[in-house]
Amino acid sequence: MNTLLSIGRSIITSAPRIVSARQTTVTARTMATVSTINMPRDPNTLSNYNNWRTKHTIADLAIDFTKQRVHGTVTLQLESITDKESEEIILDTSFVDVQSVAVDGNKTGEWTLEKRIEPFGTPLSVKIPGGAAKGTVIALAITLSTTDKCTALQWLTPAQTSNKKFPYMFSQCQAIHNRSIFPCQDTPDVKSTYDFRIRSPLPVLASGLPRGAGSFVHGENGESGTLLYSFYQEIPMPSYLFALASGDIATASIGPRSLVSTGPEELIGAKWELERDTEKFIETIEKIVYPYEWTQYNVLVLPPSFPYGGMENPVFTFATPTIISGDRENVDVVAHELAHSWSGNLVSNASWEHFWLNEGWTVYLERRIIAAVHGEAYRDFSSIIGWKALEDSVKLYGEDHEFTKLIVDLKGKDPDDAFSSVPYEKGFHFLYYLERLVGKPSWDKFIPHYFTTWKKKSLDSYDFKATLLDFFASDSAASKALESVDWDSWFYKPGLPSKPEFDTSLVDKCYALAKKWESKDYTPSPSDIEGWAANQVVVFLQQVQLFTTPLTPVQSQAMGKAYNLVNTKNVELSSRYFGVGLAAKDETVYQPTAELLGKVGRMKFVRTLYRKLVVVDRKLAVETFEKNKDFYHPICRDQVEKDLKE
């Protein structure tokens, strides 16, 4: 391993700002007392995780829907990885009410919450007098409560749920929000096993395998009684994969090792949507990488305010309800989140500066699943849609922007601000380029090697490079081909990479129909898109959005009526059509856009539509946001606030 690391770093000589941070030692810091620490390679944590590593986490927590708080005790078992060099453990926290800290059962130890450092939070310093010998494990038991400033949890009132009967709570910890639930080493460079013991009046799901529920306690003052729900996770996972949800949740089988959970009224529809493809997807990716290691693969379909398409929490993928469209056209989200079970969950990026290692690999594997199930042309079809998303992100940021690089500089920055399609699609294109360079048969041998080498570990881009070059060192043809890779350009050059030649067989008719719409006189008919898959309509709408001259309002209205795009349940279609209508300044789509923004919390749709709506009707955009801001998840709300600033 050391050999690989030195190879990986010595090759990249033209990027002197990147150093092997794991080998850098400093002897002072500004936050608290002087202490010897090894500088970590993740700039978005305040923890001294290169001196101490969390090995196991026990979360004994209660969910209080009345006060909208999670409270209890979290015990971190931390191993000293130096020999008495560090006399304190520093943990990440953000807006957590820390009430006590016990060190190996001793509550008389010294601990301090330091000054808050934006955007990362408040470091919690726990004194360990004399330090600890290398390999010693120290248990920190931290009693705490979340606060109303917690950025990881969203609380829904009964009125915000579909059946209006019970409250609901769910977490979203990626990228650096676990620290707002409990103090931790909030970095993907640290992995821990977990025990969850969660008390709630409503059913609970977590990112672990269920042990069952019991230990009923009667409620007081007319409140509901509670059960203790237990889960365990024996595969070490990073802090951002800690996940909880509690509410009126019903469950059904969608395969031999898979369940779907959602609201009781939505269960039948969700089961139908997912049961055909889930096991097929699992069996397909197992042939590409290796067998699934997390025992169960389940899907929790969340209320509509969930900010992402899906979140790859182990055992239970958290998914947006927008995938339940009644036509099985959006189940590729499941393929994506399933692929994360290998890329991201088993093998993790060491910091959010190397996020492409999670998402680029996942998009790559997702498209390999699609190709195996539907045919190779579908991989290129998906890639064409992805290329448009990449172009949109680069256009939004500007082609010279830091956040359009594969490796981004996040020092002092909130990783959420860098979230876009760039790590997904630019990362995919880098891997797709390497596949074509060495040849698919050779590349397919590298895939399981890579995921075996880094299983249960974290890596950065230089580790990836070293692993790749080492694997192909004995293959003279592949090694020769890899000599042509301009690593510096791929890693550090902003903007778009070279566009590959795609198989356009599935999109040619989409392009042809879009071409017809360039004429102001074109009269549409429902037969134009008869027999089309939803994603083909997506490609058509994307092409129309590229027009130099937008449609007229009359054209926009004719399109919506002929192709039934206003009332479709498929948000992938309605959101893009509204984008076309807003560009056309078609006032008949303004109110439907505002209504959709009150029903969907997925940032992919919400942020895009607000950016377009604010251009044509700032007043309506601001009013819509003010009306719905409590509906949105805190992560989404914060990003839209930034989007709407003048």
Swiss-Prot record:
Its cofactor is Zn(2+). It catalyses: leukotriene A4 + H2O = leukotriene B4. Keywords: Cytoplasm, Hydrolase, Leukotriene biosynthesis, Metal-binding, Metalloprotease, Nucleus, Protease, Zinc. One of its GO terms (cellular component) is cytosol. Binds 1 zinc ion per subunit. Zn(2+) binds at residues 336, 340, 359. It comes from the Eukaryota. GO terms for molecular function: aminopeptidase activity; epoxide hydrolase activity; leukotriene-A4 hydrolase activity; metallopeptidase activity; zinc ion binding. PROSITE patterns: ZINC_PROTEASE. Pathway: Lipid metabolism; leukotriene B4 biosynthesis. A peptide binds at residues 172-174, 307-312. It is an enzyme of class 3 (hydrolase). Transmembrane segments: none annotated. GO terms for biological process: cytoplasm to vacuole targeting by the NVT pathway; lipid metabolic process; peptide catabolic process; protein catabolic process; proteolysis. InterPro entries: Aminopeptidase_N-like_N, Aminopeptidase_N-like_N_sf, ARM-type_fold, LTA4H, LTA4H_cat, M1_LTA-4_hydro/amino_C_sf, M1_LTA4H, Peptidase_M1. Its EC number is 3.3.2.6. The active site is at residues 337, 424. Aminopeptidase that preferentially cleaves tripeptides. Also has low epoxide hydrolase activity (in vitro). Can hydrolyze an epoxide moiety of LTA(4) to form LTB(4) (in vitro). Belongs to the peptidase M1 family. This is Leukotriene A-4 hydrolase homolog. The lineage of its organism: Eukaryota, Fungi, Dikarya, Ascomycota, Pezizomycotina.
